[in-house]
Regions:
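Active-site neighborhood of phospho(di)ester-bond hydrolases with catalytic His/Asp-centered motifs
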Residues: 5-7, 27-32, 85-90, 116-120, ...
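N-terminal active-site segment of His-dependent metallophosphoesterases
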Residues: 1-86, 93-100, 165-172
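Binuclear metal-dependent phosphoesterase catalytic core
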Residues: 23, 124, 213, 222-241, ...
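Short amphipathic alpha-helices and their capping/turn segments at secondary-structure boundaries
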Residues: 14-22, 72-76, 117-126, 131, ...
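Active-site-proximal loop/helix segment associated with metal-binding centers of metalloenzymes
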Residues: 131-200, 205-220
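Active-site environment of divalent metal-dependent phosphoester hydrolases
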Residues: 10-16, 34-38, 91-101, 122-124, ...
Length: 287
């Protein structure tokens, strides 16, 4: 099976066309692709006047244009790849509610028969089981100081709202709890298969401090919002053949036990600025 992996496209700033010149079977979108709330607030055009305005590039507010850009992007991906697997990053939930954002993305992806949005979900393609989720961090294994400090340090906890707790923003304790539930979900799924079954984990936050760029290695607290140390989990589950992530805007490709861990982020592009991430638009992974 041939897989193309991309993450951190940030289509809210600029468009991109992901091609399939190598005949890949699966495209993985490992998070931070678009903002879910934009899709909810700006549904697809329903009349010819709106469609004409979009075609001409007129009459669009920024967020409406972003929503249409994302829908067009999904259409192109659906056309060019036999299968598309998409997990949300943290940016997907900006300016909206967490669980509502998941629902919005499920709804958009469900419009295409070969695009699968995963959040504590699986998709079987040929003989490979794909397990996907944002996989938030454990905040340095629920370290109290990290939980307290991240609330003031990261945008996630200022502009993502919690759905069921009144009008409050997401907290580090919320994501640490979500991390625990996702890992338990992955374990439960794998326990239901024979040991020779091949798995691919599609996530956004990183599963190892090996995905930390050296220039940030000293920042223990902030790294708690980017990385979790899942080395033992990975070593205990050698049936995971590939683990993809995004979030950090630096590419990584390394092995833990029998699991290949890969990150291939584009990063920000806007108004002539192109972030130097070192991403590979022609990457092909094999499982």
């Amino acid at each position: 099976m041939k897989i193309k992996l991309v993450s951190d496209l940030h289509l809210e700033f600029s468009d991109i066309n992901i091609t399939n010149d190598d005949g890949c079977d699966v495209l993985i979108l490992s998070g931070d692709i678009m903002v879910a709330q934009d899709m909810h607030d700006h549904p697809e055009p329903v009349n010819t006047a709106e469609q004409a305005a979009i075609a001409a590039g007129t009459g669009l507010g920024r967020r409406q244009a972003n929503a249409q850009r994302f829908r067009d992007f999904l259409k192109r991906c659906s056309f060019q790849f036999p299968h598309v697997i998409y997990v949300a990053g943290n940016h997907e939930f900006y300016h909206g509610k967490f669980f509502a954002g998941i629902d919005y993305l499920r709804e958009e992806c469900a419009k295409f028969p070969n695009v699968y949005f995963l959040e504590n979900d699986t998709k079987i393609i040929d003989d490979v089981v794909f397990m996907g989720a944002t996989l938030w961090t454990d905040c340095n294994k629920h370290d109290p100081f990290t939980l307290h400090a991240l609330a003031d340090m990261m945008n996630d906890f200022r502009i993502i709202r919690h759905d069921y707790a009144g009008y409050r923003t997401l907290k580090p304790t919320d994501i640490a709890d979500r991390h625990r539930k996702t890992l338990q979900y992955f374990k439960t799924v794998m326990d239901g298969y024979p040991p020779e079954q091949k798995f691919v984990v599609v996530g956004h936050h990183t599963p190892s401090h090996m995905s930390c760029h050296p220039q940030y290695a000293h920042d223990y607290i902030m790294n708690g919002g980017y990385h979790s140390d899942l080395s033992d989990f990975i070593l205990d589950h050698p049936q995971i053949k590939l683990w993809t992530h995004g979030h950090t805007h630096h590419p990584f490709d390394y092995v833990i036990g029998s699991t290949r861990v890969v990150c291939n982020p584009r990063g920000y592009e806007n108004d002539g600025y192109s972030e130097e991430t070192g991403w590979n638009p022609n990457i092909v992974l094999e499982v």
